């Protein structure tokens, strides 16, 4: 058995400005920092053996801030996967016993919003119509201009999960994933076997952990950590 913790990053500066963010590398706002800390309080008693984040800073900030509350007191360290940099994260002392490896991958990035990135969501709805923007944001296979649909996002997130994260769970390793609304929606769609219609209405608030227990045969959703 193993725990899988999924956490959408805390609010970013652009979330608060109501702008499409996508792959633009925007940091957390003060509210987002507070949300990450509260999320850390919520999961502080759950065992964590390794951490995965996207390549975007708001995802990394959320994971690092949350882990400052963890009862293990272990320190996350970024593992460099590039062969030319791999030696940089090697630890040559027993300090390794007080660390938790953290892996970053663009496979977990938010969906790429293409030509909507940086645009105000309200003004975009006024320009293209609310139904068109809703279709871009919530439908399964319709992508914004030069961007990704949720289906496209799942084409990178799900293989990464199945090839890299799931084997760890099968080996009873507890995994914490800090990522984004749409990258996590695509993973939850796969984990819970949701239909296209069901994922259409799936909303993930910022800074609220979702916890699954891998039983060895299936994923079971953990009771809510927040009231």
Curated annotation (Swiss-Prot):
Pfam families: His_Phos_1. The keyword Secreted does not apply. Its EC number is 5.4.2.11. Substrate binds at residues 8-15, 21-22, 58, 110-113, 121, 137-138, 181-182. The active site is at 9 (tele-phosphohistidine intermediate), 110 (proton donor/acceptor). One of its GO terms (molecular function) is phosphoglycerate mutase activity. SUPFAM superfamilies: Phosphoglycerate mutase-like. It is an enzyme of class 5 (isomerase). One of its GO terms (biological process) is glycolytic process. Pathway: Carbohydrate degradation; glycolysis; pyruvate from D-glyceraldehyde 3-phosphate: step 3/5. InterPro entries: His_Pase_superF_clade-1, His_PPase_superfam, Phosphogly_mut1. It catalyses: (2R)-2-phosphoglycerate = (2R)-3-phosphoglycerate. Keywords: Gluconeogenesis, Glycolysis, Isomerase. CDD domains: HP_PGM_like. The record marks 180 as: Transition state stabilizer. Belongs to the phosphoglycerate mutase family. BPG-dependent PGAM subfamily. Catalyzes the interconversion of 2-phosphoglycerate and 3-phosphoglycerate. This is 2,3-bisphosphoglycerate-dependent phosphoglycerate mutase. It comes from Chlamydia abortus (strain DSM 27085 / S26/3).
């Amino acid at each position: 058995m193993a725990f899988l913790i999924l956490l959408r990053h805390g609010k970013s500066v652009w979330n608060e400005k109501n702008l499409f963010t996508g792959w633009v590398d925007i940091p957390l706002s003060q509210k987002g920092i507070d949300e990450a800390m509260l999320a850390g309080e919520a999961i502080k008693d759950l065992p964590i053996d390794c951490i995965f984040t996207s390549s975007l800073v708001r995802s990394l900030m959320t994971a690092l801030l949350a882990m400052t509350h963890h009862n293990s007191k272990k320190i996350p360290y970024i593992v460099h996967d590039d062969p030319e940099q791999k030696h940089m994260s090697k630890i040559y002392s027993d300090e390794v016993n007080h660390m938790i490896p953290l892996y970053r991958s663009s496979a977990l990035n938010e969906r790429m919003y293409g030509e909507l990135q940086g645009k105000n969501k309200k003004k975009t709805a006024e320009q293209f119509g609310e139904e068109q923007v809703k279709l871009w944001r919530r439908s399964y296979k319709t992508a914004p201009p030069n961007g990704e649909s949720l289906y496209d996002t799942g084409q990178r997130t799900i293989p990464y999960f199945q090839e890299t994260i799931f084997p760890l769970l099968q080996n009873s390793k507890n995994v914490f994933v800090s990522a984004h609304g749409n990258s996590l929606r695509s993973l939850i769609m796969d984990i819970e076997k949701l239909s296209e219609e069901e994922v259409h209405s799936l909303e993930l608030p910022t800074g609220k952990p979702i916890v699954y227990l891998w039983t060895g045969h299936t994923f079971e959703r953990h009771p809510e950590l927040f009231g």
